[in-house]
């Protein structure tokens, strides 16, 4: 198939906006699925994990392929829960377009904003879908306004919903100025008719706005439009596509996926408005020396964006950016400098595999036989090595202790955890001070799924400690240190001297700078100093928590021609950091969460009072229909078990969502309690 007829898209949204239901309908309406499943019945294709079907949520991104109007569409359905945001991150990294789904009542929600920023970061063209138009209180134009105000985007109204009394029955397509009305009993069937009188004025108003926006993209059409020329539907669709690809605006559609209304128009929009691999900007290499454009005739280049372990071994999901690949070929993993032999190639349909002998630029497939490849690694032709930008995983904010109930399972537990962590870059595996196994993740649900998988997928009974906050440490003042490492016990010794300055910086990262002039320290030893600092920063001086938010500057030093080594300078850097941190007024940092609560108005006071008792701060209050939306920030340490307390306060009528915001200094009294407890 020609690249022009290929679409690689993702379905992204806040949890419960209807992503998976929409994906199920897309599969059904394209003929890829004969019998539709439902999320609430645990029978959908893309939610195939046991944990997904039990909980009715998407946990892992799933890839499926469908055909529509002679086009092939690779679809990745992503999770909406913040704990699994790494799945959205790595999916957007390899996609050419996205359908962003919004609930017609809730509108733009916290995870909608997080996903939107990720799509901005990767420059992914988007179309928006206001879903669940059958809900009581559905307000399409209010959601359009929220897209403009909360996301800073330029929404382009392409559809208008049509209601009979309060029942959603169809939509007006402003490009063709026709009304599509669905059969009440069969979403496959709809009629296209003239716009009814009660909608003609509104349709004319929004059609004029649509034309006014689009003609700005074409000088010739603009001149004709000013002279009264009528714009044709094909011209409008071409200009919408042009604006979507350039990021000038986002078309907004409407539908009710669950009621099977509007699904065909979503598929049409994917084909008409979202770009092919050839229409998006090529992928830049890490060194900036190359732009990898979609070209089947070039040297092979691909990015591994996901690794999944199933009963048959590891599946490595890749996006091919350039060239072609056949099963049995040998490729180079440039991140680790290892060659890989491709065993089999599969086109994935959720958990079902279709074998392929050959793939090319634009394809998203799974490879079997990878032994050294992890998420974010580049695979390429050995004769044309390059490195693509890796996928950055967020830092975990919560830890749990996991131990096997039987000592005989200790080794199996380690192997299982390494397999799970290998699949999910937002998980971390470490050993605590007492030798216990620590698993760090993005939230309570994230870690619950890990425990559930250990017991269900690996048949290992475990005991689990209470979730703990992933604290950090930082410095608040500058400190200078002159450290000499000298070791002499007969034979070759060890010697290294470093003079360093450590200073606080914004954020929680670590920066290193060498100001060495001349040959005070040979160039080959300077990376060892940085490595020593970074190793030491894994365990701060207050409570052994990771340390960040500082810059290390190597000012001067000395070496010995016979006794100096990389090891000696690494030790010197490590010990210099420890001394400096003790002098630089270290402080404990805690993760602060962005919290959104949707509550009936008569419970607003209770919710705000409870948040204040949890050391929270209220950012704003907004009206949403008959409810009130409270936006706040609160320390994660105070939010464990919050959902139960909220249900009690509001008789089960309120809901909330929580996303990581930033790290902030822990109040001294709280910090003392945390450190003394440790």
Swiss-Prot record:
Q: Which SMART domains match?
A: EFG_C (SM00838), EFG_IV (SM00889)
What is the name listed in the Swiss-Prot or TrEMBL entry for this protein?
Elongation factor G 2
Q: Which GO terms describe its molecular function?
A: GTP binding; GTPase activity; guanosine tetraphosphate binding; translation elongation factor activity
**A Pfam family:** EFG_C
Q: Report keywords, A-Z.
A: Cytoplasm, Elongation factor, GTP-binding, Nucleotide-binding, Protein biosynthesis
Where does the tr-type G domain lie?
Answer: 4-278
UniProt entry tagged with the keyword tRNA-binding: no
HAMAP family attached to this UniProt entry: EF_G_EF_2_B (MF_00054_B)
Residue positions binding GTP: 13-20, 77-81, 131-134
Record carries keyword Disulfide bond: no
Cellular component aspect of the GO annotation: cytoplasm
Recorded coiled-coil stretches: none
């Amino acid at each position: 198939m020609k690249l022009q007829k290929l679409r690689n898209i993702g379905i992204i949204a806040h949890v419960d906006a209807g992503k998976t239901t929409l994906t199920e309908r897309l599969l059904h309406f394209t003929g890829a699925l004969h019998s539709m499943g439902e999320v609430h019945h645990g029978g959908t294709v893309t939610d195939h994990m046991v944990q997904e079907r039990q909980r009715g949520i998407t946990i892992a991104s799933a890839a499926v392929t469908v055909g529509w109007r002679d086009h092939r569409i690779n679809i990745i359905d992503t999770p909406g829960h913040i704990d699994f945001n790494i799945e959205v991150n790595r999916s957007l990294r390899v996609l050419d377009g996205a359908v962003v789904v919004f609930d017609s009542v809730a509108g733009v929600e916290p995870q909608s904003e997080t996903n939107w920023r990720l799509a901005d970061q990767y420059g992914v063209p988007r179309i928006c879908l206001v879903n669940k138009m059958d809900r009581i209180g559905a307000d399409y134009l209010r959601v359009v306004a929220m897209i403009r105000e909360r996301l800073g985007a330029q929404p382009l109204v392409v559809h208008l919903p049509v209601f009979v009394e309060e029942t959603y029955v169809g939509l007006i397509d402003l490009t063709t100025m026709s009304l599509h009305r669905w059969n009440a009993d069969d979403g496959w069937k709809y009629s296209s008719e003239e716009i009814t009188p009660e909608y003609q004025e509104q349709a004319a108003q929004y059609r004029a706005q649509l034309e006014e926006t689009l003609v700005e993209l074409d000088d010739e059409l603009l001149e004709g439009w000013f002279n009264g020329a009528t714009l044709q539907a094909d011209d409008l669709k071409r200009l919408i596509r042009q604006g979507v690809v350039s990021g000038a605006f986002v078309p907004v559609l409407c539908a009710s996926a669950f009621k099977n209304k509007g699904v065909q128009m979503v598929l049409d929009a994917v084909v008409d408005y979202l770009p092919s691999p050839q229409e998006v900007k090529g992928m830049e290499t890490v060194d900036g020396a190359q732009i990898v454009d979609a070209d089947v005739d070039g040297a092979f280049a691909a990015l591994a964006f996901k690794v999944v372990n199933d009963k048959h071994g590891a599946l490595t999901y890749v996006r091919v950016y350039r060239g072609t690949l056949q099963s049995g070929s040998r490729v180079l993993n440039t991140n680790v400098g290892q060659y890989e032999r491709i065993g089999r190639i599969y086109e994935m349909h959720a958990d079902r595999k279709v074998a392929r002998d050959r793939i090319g630029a634009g394809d998203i497939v799974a490879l079997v036989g990878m032994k050294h490849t992890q998420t974010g690694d580049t695979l390429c032709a050995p004769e044309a090595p390059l490195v693509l930008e890796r996928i950055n995983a967020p830092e975990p904010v919560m830890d749990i202790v996991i131990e096997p109930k039987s000592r005989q399972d200790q080794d199996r537990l380690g192997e299982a955890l390494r397999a799970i962590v290998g699949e999910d870059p937002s998980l971390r595996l470490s050993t605590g001070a007492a030798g216990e196994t620590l698993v760090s993740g993005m939230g309570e649900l994230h870690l619950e799924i890990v425990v559930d998988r250990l017991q269900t997928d690996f048949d290992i009974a475990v005991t689990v400690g209470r979730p703990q906050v992933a604290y950090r440490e930082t410095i608040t003042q500058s400190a200078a240190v002159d450290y000499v490492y000298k070791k002499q016990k007969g034979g070759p010794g060890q010697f290294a001297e470093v003079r360093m300055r450590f200073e606080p910086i914004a954020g929680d990262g670590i920066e290193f700078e060498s100001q060495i002039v001349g040959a005070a320290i040979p160039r080959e030893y300077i990376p060892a100093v940085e490595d020593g600092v970074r190793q030491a920063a894994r365990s701060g001086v207050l409570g052994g928590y990771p340390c960040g938010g500082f810059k290390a500057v190597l000012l001067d030093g000395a070496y010995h021609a016979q006794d100096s080594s990389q090891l000696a300078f690494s030790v010197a850097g490590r010990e210099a950091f420890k001394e400096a941190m003790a002098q630089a007024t270290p402080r404990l940092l805690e993760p602060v969460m962005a919290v959104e609560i949707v509550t009936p108005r008569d419970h607003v006071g209770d919710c705000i009072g409870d948040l204040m008792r949890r050391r929270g701060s209220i950012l704003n209050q907004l009206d949403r229909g008959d409810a009130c939306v409270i936006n706040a920030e609160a320390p994660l340490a105070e939010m464990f078990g919050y959902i139960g307390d909220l249900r009690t306060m509001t008789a089960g009528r309120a809901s909330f969502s929580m996303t990581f915001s930033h790290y902030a200094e822990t109040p001294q009294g709280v910090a003392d309690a945390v450190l003394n407890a440790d």
